[in-house]
Amino acid sequence: MKLQIILLISAFILLLSISHTEAFLGFLKNLFGKRALRDLNKYDYMSDPSFSAEDIKALRELFR
C-alpha cells in the first residue's frame, strides 16, 4: 500500500513538473520569438478606414 501511494505521488509530481516546464518553455519561446521582439500591433490603427489623415498624424505623435 505504501508503494502505491509513493508511486502515485511521484507520478503526480512528475506530471506537474512536465506541465510547468512546457509552459515555461512556451513563455520563453514567445518572449524571444520574432513576433514578440517586434510590436506588430503598434500600427493596427492605420488600417481603420474611419481615421482621417489628421487622426493618424496625432496618433503617430502620441506613439513617439
Curated annotation (Swiss-Prot):
Source organism of this protein record = Chaerilus tryznai (Scorpion)
By sequence similarity, the record places it as follows: Belongs to the non-disulfide-bridged peptide (NDBP) superfamily. Short antimicrobial peptide (group 4) family.
Propeptide residue ranges?
36-64
The UniProt-reported impact of residue 26 to H is: Shows similar virucidal activities than the wild-type, but enhances cellular uptake and improves intracellular distribution
Q: Which UniProt keywords apply?
A: Amidation, Antimicrobial, Antiviral protein, Secreted, Signal
- Give residues where Phenylalanine amide occurs: 32
Protein name, per record: Peptide Ctry2459
Provide the tissue specificity.
Answer: Expressed by the venom gland.
